Curated annotation (Swiss-Prot):
Keywords: Ribonucleoprotein, Ribosomal protein. It comes from Mycolicibacterium gilvum (strain PYR-GCK) (Mycobacterium gilvum (strain PYR-GCK)). Signal peptide: none annotated. This is Large ribosomal subunit protein bL33A. GO terms for biological process: translation. The keyword Ribonucleoprotein applies. GO terms for molecular function: structural constituent of ribosome. GO terms for cellular component: cytosolic large ribosomal subunit. It comes from the Bacteria. Belongs to the bacterial ribosomal protein bL33 family. InterPro entries: Ribosomal_bL33 (IPR001705), Ribosomal_bL33_CS (IPR018264), Ribosomal_bL33_sf (IPR038584), Ribosomal_zn-bd (IPR011332). It holds the Pfam family Ribosomal_L33.
Length: 54
């Protein structure tokens, strides 16, 4: 297995509808479903949920 198969690069898109994204890696073995992280969105200047975008 290559490195990219185990820990692929994923985009996290803001649920506030601003279009702001973060880019991160995820471990498929620990998180087989889509990731949801609470991070800062500078467009709306507050913390919002960011969901994995495929």
């Amino acid at each position: 297995m290559t490195r990219n198969e185990i820990r692929p690069i994923v985009k996290l898109r803001s649920t506030a509808g601003t279009g702001y994204t973060y880019v991160t890696r995820k471990n498929r073995r620990n998180d087989p479903d889509r990731i949801v992280l609470r991070k800062y969105d500078p467009v709306v200047r507050r913390h919002v949920d960011f969901r994995e975008d495929r």
